[in-house]
Amino acid sequence: SAAKYIGTSMKEIIRDSFCLEYEKGVVSIVEIMGRNAGWLTGSTALSQGEDCEGPDLIYLPELPFDLQLFGEKIRQLLQEKTSIVVAVSEGIRTADGTYVCELGNSIDFVDAFGHKQLSGTASYLASYIAGEIGCKTRAIELSTLQRAASHAASRVDILEAYQVGGAAVKAADEGDTGKMVVLKRLSDDPYQCGTEVKDVHKIANDEKLVPRSWVNKEGTYVTNEFISYVRPLIQGDVSPVMVDGIPRHLYTPKELSHR
């Protein structure tokens, strides 16, 4: 569902950029969740279609980020078109391991796993490009909306959530403990997915990274293999219950009184 929202939002951002007219062009940089894995950032490529070319550049955290080459690429693209849209993961790093967002400020807050709180990647890059090239820039951070936009939920996602929940109840009823239900893809075409029960201690704080072969040689875009893998996950729609034009959420009076 997050990928569906991100792909949709990217398409709308690109469409909006058509309305922007500046003498030296405009560069919009969209920051997307992803500390070490670029699945969500790569999903911006889902905006591609007969009515949209998709973002001009996509940068994932799996590959080192070269600030100078980035600037040169933007300068080159501005020779070809007046509006550039770039997708970047919040966790992109330079070759020495420095987060790009750290280039503009220091990060002191860490979570329970010792992870630094990442924010400001798009803002830093927008300022850098504005200073180097002198064009108009926009920094867009999707932030919480990426995981909260339930009005754009994928039906496949919802059905698999039920599938995982059912498998978890079955495993618990059979006496399993300290376990976690995971999804396992069985086929791509037609798309089919099953469940497995795994030891949670072997999964917690682990990550599945985007394969290098699913990113182009220059490290500036995802391949068709990536798109083919992700696209089945965003299929189908779920219509929320609407009240006075706004989606209605499940709630309890007690819950509301403590907020």
Regions found by a protein language model. Give the residues of each.
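Accessory alpha-helical/coil subdomains and C-terminal extensions
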Residues: S1-R138
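C-terminal non-catalytic interaction/assembly regions of soluble proteins
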Residues: E102-R259
